[in-house]
Amino acid sequence: MFSVTRRRAAGAAAAMATATGTLYWMTSQGDRPLVHNDPSYMVQFPTAAPPQVSRRDLLDRLAKTHQFDVLIIGGGATGTGCALDAATRGLNVALVEKGDFASGTSSKSTKMIHGGVRYLEKAFWEFSKAQLDLVIEALNERKHLINTAPHLCTVLPILIPIYSTWQVPYIYMGCKFYDFFAGSQNLKKSYLLSKSATVEKAPMLTTDNLKASLVYHDGSFNDSRLNATLAITAVENGATVLNYVEVQKLIKDPTSGKVIGAEARDVETNELVRINAKCVVNATGPYSDAILQMDRNPSGLPDSPLNDNSKIKSTFNQIAVMDPKMVIPSIGVHIVLPSFYCPKDMGLLDVRTSDGRVMFFLPWQGKVLAGTTDIPLKQVPENPMPTEADIQDILKELQHYIEFPVKREDVLSAWAGVRPLVRDPRTIPADGKKGSATQGVVRSHFLFTSDNGLITIAGGKWTTYRQMAEETVDKVVEVGGFHNLKPCHTRDIKLAGAEEWTQNYVALLAQNYHLSSKMSNYLVQNYGTRSSIICEFFKESMENKLPLSLADKENNVIYSSEENNLVNFDTFRYPFTIGELKYSMQYEYCRTPLDFLLRRTRFAFLDAKEALNAVHATVKVMGDEFNWSEKKRQWELEKTVNFIKTFGV
């Protein structure tokens, strides 16, 4: 009895001591400064980007450099990825792109960083090691991409509604295998939801025959902004990267026939430039066959004249490649819908489409992205357009899932992109029959070197761009005989805007610049730690705070508030401002209104009709900055309006 009492007394004393110590610690904190005054919590907001090389200086460097180590043709995901990889290894790099960065396929993806659950299913049913290798490679690269550009990427839960009892264990095991093959790179574990929990998460789903749902995780990202960020990061690492420079001819050694460079034209000035290089890489995606034609031709010229872009065309659906040998062209169409078509922070996956495809419905930039179709073609179009049948096909599939009526008038935007599905052009049979179906094609990449030394990389997808670039630059090092280079380290490079990024940057930016949470969130998700530079433009003038859709209206009243409440656009539908446009022109090589409205921002992709309201102001601001003539302004205005009108509106 005595021992029990003693133990209780000892326990009480210990508890008292702990309480006293805790009380002392709590009261002693009053003598310390508040946490936001602690220097360790202070953030240095950049007010200017690293010294930017002007386009004029890049053109001069392109023309005056005696010989580059490597010339990369194509400024999409793979091309800019190659430029960054090669530059950071120590090579002297030139890259030219005939349009804007991501003006082709690289801006028209499903905005997913994924291994591909559909490929995993095919791998098992078809006993395909190629499909399985594709999944494993993509799962590894998925995590690397999110780490190098965390401001542009996010982990996205995706819900698969299940309407057959037998599918519950089938889909559950499939997603668990997906987690397993990701290994240490897995984002989050998949999990099963009951019918009631599914309806709570996604009340828009039809409940007829709904049994349960499975949630797995992949990544979501902003494709064209990532593309521009890769180009900018490559320039900041010493590469000579230029948009609107079109290769017109490959230069060949007169004795050996080896490709030793290219003749190119600056689209803006019509200046011609000769680019000499030890190695040349063809990274033009679905347009790879156009450069391969130049490679096969002893003169280095294309088989057919290049498109005449000197005047506005009545149609944008020109043919880029008449008879592709390497690329198996396929069109994928996406549409954008209001946010109520899927949960705010969770995507939906349709695994039971009428023709055996899968279809995604994903939250993206405050809207819902739905797609895609898979339509085989015989030719490669320059700028494919969605048809009404394509749009209706997606709406029809969506209606299978949605409880309320799916309406055509809800479509805010629609666009089409060419998938760069590939095969080895050296294996085409003599009769030239290449087939047209694409669903059975592995969405992998293909790298080969022609007899003339041209290195071509094509295929793949956004998720694996970094791996594709690494393999390509490895081949450049081999073909060029380069020595004493740094190893590839693009897995660890923080892209422009990811430097010093933290998950609290939205709050820190809002506090420092007195932004609304909506504006701060938008800027950080698209520009990362460089968003503060746009805020400096806001501080320069009231005009820079105007949203572009209102900027050409007379007698604008921006807002009525205290002086230090810098920008509060919660009352406006879209946060795209004059300040952001000026930043894009000064720091991101934005050269045309379409560059800004489609690719530096995603305005036209998100709401084509509303983007049309911003065209006049965009042309005016850019025209004033670049000293455009009235004729040039009118040309850009018509071109921009006509192009945006092809977005399903």
Curated annotation (Swiss-Prot):
Gene3D superfamilies: Alpha-glycerophosphate oxidase, cap domain (1.10.8.870), D-Amino Acid Oxidase, subunit A, domain 2 (3.30.9.10), FAD/NAD(P)-binding domain (3.50.50.60). The lineage of its organism: Eukaryota, Fungi, Dikarya, Ascomycota, Saccharomycotina. It comes from Saccharomyces cerevisiae (strain ATCC 204508 / S288c). This is Glycerol-3-phosphate dehydrogenase, mitochondrial. InterPro entries: DAO_C (IPR031656), DAO_C_sf (IPR038299), FAD-dep_OxRdtase (IPR006076), FAD/NAD-bd_sf (IPR036188), G3P_DH_FAD-dep (IPR000447). The keyword NAD does not apply. Present with 1670 molecules/cell in log phase SD medium. It is found in: Mitochondrion inner membrane; Mitochondrion intermembrane space. The gene is GUT2. One of its GO terms (molecular function) is glycerol-3-phosphate dehydrogenase (quinone) activity. Belongs to the FAD-dependent glycerol-3-phosphate dehydrogenase family. GO terms for biological process: glycerol catabolic process; glycerol metabolic process; glycerol-3-phosphate metabolic process; glycerol-3-phosphate shuttle. FAD binds at residues 69-97. Its EC number is 1.1.5.3. Pathway: Polyol metabolism; glycerol degradation via glycerol kinase pathway; glycerone phosphate from sn-glycerol 3-phosphate (anaerobic route): step 1/1. The keyword Mitochondrion applies. It comes from the Eukaryota. Its main location: mitochondrion. Its cofactor is FAD. Signal peptide: none annotated. One of its GO terms (cellular component) is mitochondrion. Keywords: FAD, Flavoprotein, Membrane, Mitochondrion, Mitochondrion inner membrane, Oxidoreductase, Transit peptide. It catalyses: a quinone + sn-glycerol 3-phosphate = dihydroxyacetone phosphate + a quinol. Transmembrane segments: none annotated. It is an enzyme of class 1 (oxidoreductase).
